[in-house]
């Protein structure tokens, strides 16, 4: 089931976000994977507590909750510089990429990294890879929010359903497959398919 082989079965489509909407996974992923790997990869351990608080604020506890990982990283790095916690070489070019790129994913970042000497691109890619590894290593204790499966079963009788997530495809396939949510979906649209907009 991909985004190129979607076959319309209904006149209506319902798109369901994964992390934080269908799946109760945002807290654990940001506290144990995204945030710690960001601090490690960008050498921010001297300001670990403040940086972790900053990361969680941007990605969980503000209007930017659920932002694409690469855009969230750009916001966090800009705030690190603003607060005087570090100097991020190549940040301006990285920020521009997050605003202009048609796709924000590891393959897209790898392509731009191969054409540039920008250390921010390189660290962002390393951080994202490390984060994916950390997510993959999480115990399979994730779960959908209550009543998600029954609601999806009911909606699937009247509409096509699609998972829409800024997470990577492997994580969404694993989580939605493990909890039988994917069986109701006509498509799993992840960061590799482009932005949610």
PLM feature spans:
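Substrate-recognition "cap/lid" segment bordering the active-site pocket of phosphatases
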Residues: 162-197
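Short, acidic, Ser/Thr-enriched surface-loop or helix-capping motifs
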Residues: 17
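Extreme N-terminal starter segment of soluble prokaryotic enzymes
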Residues: 10-14
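Alpha-helical substrate-recognition element adjacent to the catalytic core
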Residues: 3, 9, 21-170, 185
